[in-house]
């Protein structure tokens, strides 16, 4: 996707309409017996008849345009899709080491170990080797200063003493006469891969290099790093290859502060770092490494930090080797580690990618992805003290391969356990080469600490990315405590295992294809225009042959299903009933078809249904036996509506269900099977077959329209979760309207489907691949593109060791289903999914459905518990804050767009275009009240910024070596920062604090403010800093007002002095922030009519008699006091579950279940009545 002027990646978050409450038209409600594909309708009036006639005239050209557009999608790009994985590995990179410390962890043995592992696994011969080259000085100057480069160049001529003195002026580095040349060679190696990837010589690549680079700043060595390879590569790609959007992912266990500082003002580079932090106790001890730092100026929102605050802590038992008397053989020797606390595991990293990185990356749409691939988070690394595995990094690599059209480059950073490092590199390289991801250890669910970090990061980023709207939900304190106890119990018994010896099967045939034209003999004898036409499978197969995909697959012969296979899901009576139709006359066939719902039967129906189901079983056999890795079954009639004893919705035998049972029979056990049903209709038959079976996880995304879309009824509702032992293993995502597209399905994948699927950890994935949600389908009314289906398939391919099977269900636009199945086949064959160039934000209706499902299923799945744990009502207080932006620049919003004067948004709310920063918080502060308002202009990253450096150490042990005495340093630093305001500020004047840049490079570090959401923040690169804070007295006064201004407070009048207190002269140019309520919520139906006695907002609290601040329940109309008085309304809500309440103070409406203010037309009557009672007149805008 290209852009001109203001790029879409720098746009301001746009306001979006919330879903409107649907009109309840009784005439539009169909009974269970309605036909599949039928739409609700009522008798047309004259206007509707005219409109229908006009639309009929326009429909033919529109349909033709759609067909032409779909045909124009060029999926036959075999000759243009780059293939091959590049590898740069040069022995010259081992020509430097620490002259004065042979035990220094960054040493040449790291590359030796990697090379041996790659040779052992045969990976070197599978890669395209590239000769490393030296980076030119002009290329280094794209990021680094000339003075710094010249200084590093002089190290070639220094003796050991001089090198040691210079290295001592930096933090955690050593210098060698060859350090400069090797650093230039390392940077040049990455640049060579950039040229190869962007020039389509290869698809992706890896640079196995040293020294690392992500800590290096513009004019500063740091943390073993001299030049920042990826930063130079990003600027190089932008300059030479005209790249406009680059994603840098840093999964090294240390925060890549150097990369962050280089790009923290730049909206063209999205930087994502996931690292060990321990609340600032871990190197590099910076507040800028915390989740609250999101970038500065136009780059705000483009810096993403996920800080890990939990590490492994193990006790061990040691059994020494000994030689029994008379024996020359050594007895058992082992060291067993029992982890009392587990560091972050694969599940935690995967959760961060699914909930944060992938959604933002799909909205950002990078054109190149660069990875700072450090492997010091692997289990056994002495620096990281984490518990990730090589298989986990293979999955992370697989996720990233779906971005930027597959243009992905990994560049080695850290990793200091030689065996773990080598396995980590080989695991990621296997994935780059297209090998399937290994299965992970169960359960794959994030721990409580990871959930907290991810939730904090999401809340910090939500103001800047539309796709993150409603990404975190409120959670009760009791539920949080229960979840944490559950996590502690599970983790307390977790025993660390040795690194698994992962194997990647090298299959000659990757994708199997089953098709038999005999299935076309099933046809409708009475309606030649029936949507379930024999041409469906023929058109798909022809298209696969035309674009060359069929030739790349292994064609497998179809076979009829055996009775024993059919009987695993269907009753014997039903099978015989269908078999009997083979000999029926035409009139009897018509009568028999009418006995079922939306069914036609012909003499060949039974044989075709038997063949379709048998084809699915044949494909299962091929996948489980290793004959192929994955496959597609182009079959008809479809199957997912078929019940155990009844045909339904064009379906006779449930092919996917029978295939699942057949797989379990082959395995001889209850194989864990994931069934994903993306057909636009709910697969009622599949759900009923497995609803009591915990070995099969059934996930369905479908049009529901509140029970009025086929197959009608409440079976597809989110509340249907399974029964008995299968409770929680049925997941329904009901769409309550049309036009759901790629963004809506991807949001569901990221937030719901993949988290649950990874936690379930299936051994086989079956997809009920109906394509009637595709663009142009006459029944679905949705807008999923072929490219969208390619991405959905790619994301599921990381599961079950890549064992995934697509079985055709519905889809009735012949062009759409052909293009969509071809796109899925591309993904199965390992081709990168195409970029989604016109991805809109998810619809509010889709987000509502997703949130509804999460609320239902979070009790069953730990991976869905990314919730707000602070009191949302307190945090969302209605305090108004005035902020003046710098006069030297036009006001800049969170995404770099101009903010209109007087834009009203709420301080601290979740959807502002320019939110105010808040005081940095930790897990222990999660229940604290709203942080004090703070305006910050950043400090220079090239100065001594003591106020933002949590600790400063210069030994080699500090990189990864957290010390226990640093807690006091952190607390002291934060306390001193909080005490910088003066009494003059308390009186309303504001004093600026500045720090001049240091001339000593050895003291350079970040000064980045940790505060998120401040549009006026500036980059640490800008030099002088100035911080404006509310005085401690003003903060206390403001906190005392929270009871009147938060949650159910409604809002007493705020003294104008409070608006400007602490801001001094910053009140001349005003930008206001206030609460933005929801325009709709799903709980409005709980609002009852006003009682006959009327509404009295002056009533006292029914429990305590208080009249200070009360609320009226809009269900029972009882009056109780606010949580800031005696919290009796909160108690009433918890006891009655009545969701909506009205403030007797300012007549605002709060929904406890949505945890938000709501303003909707359904509330106008009660608000008008309250206004009449309170002020003696109706609301002005209603008169």
Swiss-Prot record:
A Gene Ontology term for the protein's cellular component: perikaryon
PROSITE patterns the record matches = ZF_UBP
- ZnF region ranges: UBP-type: 1079-1177
Q: Which InterPro entries does this one have?
A: HDAC_PDAC, His_deacetylse, His_deacetylse_dom, His_deacetylse_dom_sf, Ureohydrolase_dom_sf, Znf_RING/FYVE/PHD, Znf_UBP
What residue spans carry the Low complexity bias annotation?
980-996, 1021-1035
Instruction: List, in alphabetical order, the GO biological process terms annotated in this UniProt record.
Output: actin filament organization; aggresome assembly; axonal transport of mitochondrion; cellular response to hydrogen peroxide; cellular response to misfolded protein; cellular response to parathyroid hormone stimulus; cellular response to topologically incorrect protein; cilium disassembly
Q: Which SMART domains match?
A: ZnF_UBP
Q: Where is this motif: Nuclear export signal?
A: 66-75
| Region (Disordered), start-end ranges | 1-61, 972-1042
Omega-N-methylarginine sites (modified residues): 32
Where in this protein does the record say Phosphoserine is found? 21, 1009
Q: How is the cofactor bound?
A: Binds 3 Zn(2+) ions per subunit.
Pathway per the UniProt entry = Protein modification; protein ubiquitination
Location within or outside the cell: Cytoplasm; Cytoplasm, Cytoskeleton; Nucleus; Perikaryon
Q: Which residues form the active site?
A: 215, 641
Entry cofactors: Zn(2+)
Record's compositionally biased regions (Polar residues): 18-29, 997-1008
Lineage: superkingdom = Eukaryota
| Self-association state and partner proteins as the record states | Forms a trimeric complex in the nucleus consisting of BANP, HDAC6 and KHDRBS1/SAM68; HDAC6 keeps KHDRBS1 in a deacetylated state which inhibits the inclusion of CD44 alternate exons. The complex is disrupted by MAPK1/MAPK3-mediated phosphorylation of BANP which results in BANP export to the cytoplasm. This facilitates acetylation of KHDRBS1 and CD44 variant exon inclusion. Interacts with SIRT2 (via both phosphorylated, unphosphorylated, active or inactive forms); the interaction is necessary for the complex to interact with alpha-tubulin.
Name under which the protein is recorded: Protein deacetylase HDAC6
Q: Which organism is it from?
A: Rattus norvegicus (Rat)
Taxonomic lineage: Eukaryota, Metazoa, Chordata, Craniata, Vertebrata
């Amino acid at each position: 996707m290209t852009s001109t002027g203001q790029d879409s990646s720098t746009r301001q978050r746009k306001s979006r309409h919330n879903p409107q409450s649907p009109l309840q038209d009784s005439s539009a409600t169909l009974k269970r017996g309605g036909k599949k594909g039928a739409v609700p309708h009522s008798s047309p009036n004259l206007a509707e008849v005219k409109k229908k006639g006009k639309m009929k005239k326009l429909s033919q050209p529109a349909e033709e345009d759609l067909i032409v557009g779909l045909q124009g999608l060029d999926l036959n790009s075999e000759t243009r899709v780059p293939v091959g994985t590049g590898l740069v590995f040069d022995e010259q990179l081992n020509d430097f080491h620490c002259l004065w410390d042979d035990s220094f962890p960054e040493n040449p043995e790291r590359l030796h170990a990697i090379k041996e592992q790659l040779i052992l696994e045969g990976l070197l011969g599978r890669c395209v080797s590239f000769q490393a080259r030296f980076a030119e000085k002009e290329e280094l100057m794209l990021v680094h200063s000339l003075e710094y480069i010249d200084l590093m160049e002089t190290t070639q001529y220094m003796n050991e003493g001089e090198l040691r003195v210079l290295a001592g002026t930096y933090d955690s580095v050593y210098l060698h006469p060859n350090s400069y040349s090797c650093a230039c060679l390392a940077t040049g190696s990455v640049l060579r891969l950039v040229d190869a990837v962007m020039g389509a010589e290869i698809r992706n690549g890896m640079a196995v290099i040293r020294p690392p680079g992500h800590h290096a700043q513009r004019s500063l060595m740091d943390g073993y790093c001299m030049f920042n390879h990826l930063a130079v590569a990003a600027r190089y790609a932008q300059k030479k290859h005209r790249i406009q959007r680059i994603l840098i992912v840093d999964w090294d266990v240390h925060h890549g502060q150097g990369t962050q500082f280089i790009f923290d003002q730049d909206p063209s580079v999205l930087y994502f770092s996931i690292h060990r932090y321990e609340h600032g106790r871990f190197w590099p001890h910076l507040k800028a490494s915390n989740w609250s730092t999101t970038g500065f100026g136009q780059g705000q929102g483009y810096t993403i930090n996920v800080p890990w605050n939990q590490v492994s802590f193990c006790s061990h038992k040691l059994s020494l080797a000994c030689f029994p008397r008379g024996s020359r053989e050594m007895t058992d020797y082992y060291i067993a580690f029992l982890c009392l606390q587990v560091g972050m595991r694969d599940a935690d990293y995967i959760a961060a990618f699914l909930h944060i990185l992938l959604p933002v990356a799909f909205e950002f749409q990078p054109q190149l992805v660069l990875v700072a691939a450090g492997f010091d988070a692997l289990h056994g690394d002495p620096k990281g003290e984490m518990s990730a595995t090589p298989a986990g990094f293979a999955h992370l690599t697989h996720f990233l391969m779906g971005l930027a059209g597959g243009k992905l480059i990994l560049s080695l950073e850290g990793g200091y356990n030689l065996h773990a490092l080598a396995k980590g590199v080989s695991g990621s390289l296997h994935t780059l080469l297209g090998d399937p991801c290994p299965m992970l250890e169960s359960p794959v669910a994030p721990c409580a600490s990871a959930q907290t970090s991810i939730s904090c990061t999401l809340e910090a980023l939500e103001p800047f990315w539309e796709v993150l709207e409603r990404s975190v939900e409120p959670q009760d304190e009791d539920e949080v405590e229960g979840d944490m106890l559950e996590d502690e119990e599970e983790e307390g018994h977790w025993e660390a295992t040795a690194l698994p010896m992962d194997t990647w099967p090298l299959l000659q045939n990757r994708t199997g294809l089953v098709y038999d034209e005999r299935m076309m003999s099933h046809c409708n004898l009475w309606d030649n225009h029936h949507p379930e036409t024999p041409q469906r499978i023929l058109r798909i197969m022809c298209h696969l042959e035309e674009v060359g995909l069929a030739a790349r697959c292994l064609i497998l012969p179809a076979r009829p299903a055996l009775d024993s296979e059919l009987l695993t899901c269907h009753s014997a009576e039903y099978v015989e009933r269908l078999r009997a139709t083979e000999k029926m006359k035409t009139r009897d066939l018509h009568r028999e078809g009418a006995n079922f719902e939306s069914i036609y039967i012909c003499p060949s129906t039974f044989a075709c249904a038997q063949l379709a189901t048998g084809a699915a079983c044949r494909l299962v056999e091929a996948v489980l036996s290793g004959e192929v890795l994955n496959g597609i079954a182009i079959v008809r009639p479809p199957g997912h509506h078929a019940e155990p004893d009844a045909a339904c919705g064009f379906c006779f035998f449930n092919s996917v269900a029978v295939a699942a049972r057949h797989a379990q029979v082959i395995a001889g056990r209850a194989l864990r099977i994931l069934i994903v049903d993306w057909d636009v209709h709910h697969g009622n038959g599949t759900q009923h077959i497995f609803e009591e079976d915990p070995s099969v996880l059934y996930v369905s995304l479908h049009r529901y329209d509140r029970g009025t879309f086929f197959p009608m009824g409440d079976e597809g509702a989110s509340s249907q979760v399974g029964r008995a032992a299968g409770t929680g293993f049925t997941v329904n995502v009901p769409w309550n309207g049309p036009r759901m597209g790629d963004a809506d399905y991807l949001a569901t994948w990221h937030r719901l489907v993949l988290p649950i699927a990874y936690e379930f950890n299936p051994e086989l994935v079956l997809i009920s691949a109906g394509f009637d949600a595709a663009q142009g389908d006459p029944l679905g009314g949705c807008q999923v593109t072929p490219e969208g289906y390619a991405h959905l398939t790619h994301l599921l391919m990381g599961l079950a060791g890549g064992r995934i099977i697509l079985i055709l269900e519905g889809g009735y636009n012949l062009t759409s289903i052909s293009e969509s199945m071809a796109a899925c086949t591309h993904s199965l064959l390992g081709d990168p999914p195409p970029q989604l160039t016109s991805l809109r934000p998810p619809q509010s209706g889709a987000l509502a459905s997703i949130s509804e499902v999460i609320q239902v299923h979070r009790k069953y799945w730990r991976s869905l518990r990314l919730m707000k744990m602070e009191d949302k009502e307190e945090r969302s207080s209605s305090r108004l804050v005035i902020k003046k932006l710098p006069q030297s620049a036009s006001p800049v919003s969170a995404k770099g767009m101009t903010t209109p004067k007087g834009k009203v948004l709420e301080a601290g709310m979740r959807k502002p275009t320019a939110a105010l920063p808040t005081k940095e918080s930790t897990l222990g502060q999660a229940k604290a009240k709203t942080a004090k308002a703070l305006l910050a202009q950043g400090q220079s990253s090239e100065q001594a910024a003591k106020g933002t450096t949590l600790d400063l150490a210069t030994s080699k042990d500090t990189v990864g070596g957290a010390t226990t005495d640093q807690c006091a340093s952190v607390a002291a630093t934060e306390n001193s920062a909080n005490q910088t305001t003066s009494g003059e500020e308390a009186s309303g004047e504001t004093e600026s604090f500045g720090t001049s840049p240091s001339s000593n490079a050895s003291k350079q570090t970040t000064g980045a403010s940790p505060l998120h959401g401040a549009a006026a923040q500036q980059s640490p690169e800008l030099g002088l800093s100035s911080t404006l804070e509310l005085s401690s007295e003003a903060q206390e006064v403001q906190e005392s007002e929270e009871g009147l201004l938060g949650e159910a407070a409604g809002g007493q009048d705020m003294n104008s002095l409070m608006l400007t207190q602490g801001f001094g002269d910053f009140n001349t140019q005003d930008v206001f922030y206030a609460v933005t309520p929801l325009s709709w919520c799903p709980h409005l139906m709980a609002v009852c009519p006003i009682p006959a006695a009327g509404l009295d907002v002056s009533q006292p609290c029914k429990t305590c008699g208080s009249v200070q601040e009360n609320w009226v329940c809009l269900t029972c109309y009882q009056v109780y006091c606010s949580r800031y008085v005696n919290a009796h309304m909160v108690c009433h809500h918890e006891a009655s579950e009545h969701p909506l309440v009205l403030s007797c103070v300012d007549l605002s409406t709060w929904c406890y279940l949505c945890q938000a203010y709501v303003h909707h037309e359904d509330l106008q009557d009660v608000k008008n009545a309250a206004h009449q009672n309170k002020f003696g007149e109706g609301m002005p805008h209603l008169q």
